[in-house]
Swiss-Prot record:
Residues 1-26, 78-97, 146-168, 238-277, 330-338, 383-400, 458-478 are cytoplasmic. It comes from Equus caballus. GO terms for molecular function: cysteine transmembrane transporter activity; ribonucleoprotein complex binding; symporter activity. This is Major facilitator superfamily domain-containing protein 12. It is a multi-pass membrane protein. The lineage of its organism: Eukaryota, Metazoa, Chordata, Craniata, Vertebrata. Residues 48-56, 119-124, 190-216, 301-308, 360-361, 422-436 are lumenal. It holds the Pfam family MFS_2. Belongs to the major facilitator superfamily.
Length: 478
């Protein structure tokens, strides 16, 4: 069976979602997107450059968060699928979304605030231990919200083009969230600079302990704005209700109706080659998007030696470019298909990597490079999510497990990659020595060009063996 094709015995196709319903769904991940923007772009920079923790210590905290997220994601996905029909008031997906939202709101501000009770004599390991529980709670909440929100896509719409449109709208608000974070960061840094008396000095143009209030205020703004949009999601999105499973009684038929659709369980997915093909492509995509977002601030600060305002303006340009690209996804997919759309996005990212390799001093051309990176990342991310929805097709009862498994590989791979990069950092006794200038230059090349080649190989496998279920026999017993 090809995912997305109608199955025998299936009910009538649901009506198309209204614009209000589509927008309500799209803002449901806004809090997660705001927090993820700060997490990936500023966590290492905050811990290493502002709090002066070692590169390995900062990488260890990010690894802890990614592993916690990765472990929680498939568990939440499995439980969300298992809870179908049990949450009579709001539905299992929305219930998990609410739990995750509360965890994020309560934990995230502590991550970007100074350690309570810590002083100048506090050893680094004790401070890192303090941040650990907040990071674990935050990542559990983030995973619960993400999986609940993603698994609603095949629940709400069935058409391929509607899935692309909903995914593109979701990503458009992801871009808006990133623009909001970087715009707020630029404003806070500018206000801090104008409040400083005396002529501007070189030290004031670079990050340091004086920037702690900027990140603390930014984290509080993030959770405040995100809470409002989460409320709008819960008020405007209706999850399709499923009747709870009933115990058989004397009036129940002994044989199930012949028209009932067999269920594709989580263990069946593990036998499908397409599950691993799409999973590898999704993991490669997330590595490119997340690692480039994580290290772009380091690259700007240490390799290009730009003032600290660029850690807000360059990511802002990237996500404006991504925002514009997201609206082209639906017509481009219709014209050239999923695979070619993804390939075009990869070509743009590889062009960025080649530019970084060939040019050491970008100057004002760094804005053009940011446009390329932002547009390419938006294209491959939206397309990979649409491919995942294609894989799930009508089997929405186990969709959360699929998204959970995909996210598990992505989160753990991201965490391990960051830890490896941080362990290779050449400056052990200071924040940045001469060697780290070239170090972050080649990190940006590796996380875009190197991982881009791996993504190309994954895409080639989908061209040879397209997405479809090959091993599952609907007539076999689970």
């Amino acid at each position: 069976m090809v995912p997305g094709s109608p199955a025998a015995g299936a009910g009538p196709a649901p009506r198309a979602l209204s614009l209000a319903a589509r927008l309500s769904y799209a803002v449901g991940h806004f809090l997660n997107d705001l927090c993820a923007s700060m997490w990936f772009t500023y966590l290492l920079l905050y811990l290493h450059s502002v709090r002066a923790y070692s590169s390995r210590g900062a990488g260890l905290l990010l690894l802890l968060g990614q592993v916690a997220d990765g472990l929680c994601t498939p568990l939440v996905g499995y439980e969300a699928d298992r809870a179908a029909g049990r949450c009579a008031r709001c539905g299992p997906r929305k219930a998990w979304h609410l739990v995750g939202t509360v965890c994020v709101l309560l934990s995230f501000p502590f991550i970007f605030s100074p350690c309570l009770g810590c002083g100048a004599a506090t050893p680094e390991w004790a401070a890192l231990l303090y941040y650990g529980p907040f990071i674990v709670v935050f990542q559990f909440g983030w995973a619960a919200t993400q999986i609940a929100h993603l698994s609603l896509i095949p629940e709400l719409v069935t058409s391929d083009h509607e899935k692309v449109e909903l995914t593109a709208l979701r990503y458009a608000f992801t871009v808006v969230a990133n623009i909001t974070v970087f715009g707020a960061a630029w404003l806070l840094l500018r206000l801090q600079g104008s409040a400083r008396e005396g002529p501007p000095d070189e030290a004031g143009d670079h990050l340091g302990v004086q920037d702690v209030p900027v990140f603390r205020t930014l984290s509080l703004c993030v959770v405040g704005v995100g809470a409002v949009f989460s409320l709008l999601f819960h008020l405007g999105t209706r999850e399709r209700r499923r009747p709870p499973a009933q115990e058989p009684d004397e009036r129940s038929p002994l044989l199930a109706p012949a028209t009932a659709r067999p269920l594709l369980l989580w263990k069946h997915w593990l036998r499908e080659p397409s599950f691993y093909q799409v999973g590898l492509l999704y993991m490669s995509t997330r590595l490119i998007v997340n690692l480039s977002q994580t290290y772009i601030a380091m690259y700007l600060t240490y390799s290009l030696n730009l003032p600290k305002k660029f850690i807000a303006t360059i990511p802002l340009v990237m996500y404006v470019s991504g925002f514009c690209s997201s609206f082209l996804m639906k017509p481009v997919n219709k014209c050239i298909g999923r695979n070619m759309t993804y390939f075009v996005g990869l070509l743009v990212i590889l062009a960025f990597a080649a530019w970084v390799v060939l040019v050491d001093e970008l100057g004002m051309a760094v804005y053009v490079a940011a446009v390329l990176l932002g547009g390419g990342c938006a294209t491959i991310l939206v397309t990979s999510l649409a491919m995942t929805a294609d894989l799930i097709g009508p089997h929405t009862h186990s969709g959360a497990f699929v998204y959970g498994a995909m996210s598990f590989s992505d989160k753990v791979a991201n965490g391990l990659a960051v830890m490896v990069i941080q362990s290779l950092h050449p400056c052990s006794l200071e924040l940045c020595c001469r060697a780290c200038v070239g170090f972050y230059h080649w990190v940006m090349v590796a996380v875009t060009g190197g991982v881009g080649v791996a993504a190309t190989l994954s895409l080639c496998s989908l061209l040879v063996w397209p997405i479809r279920l090959r091993s599952w026999d609907p007539g076999a017993q689970p």
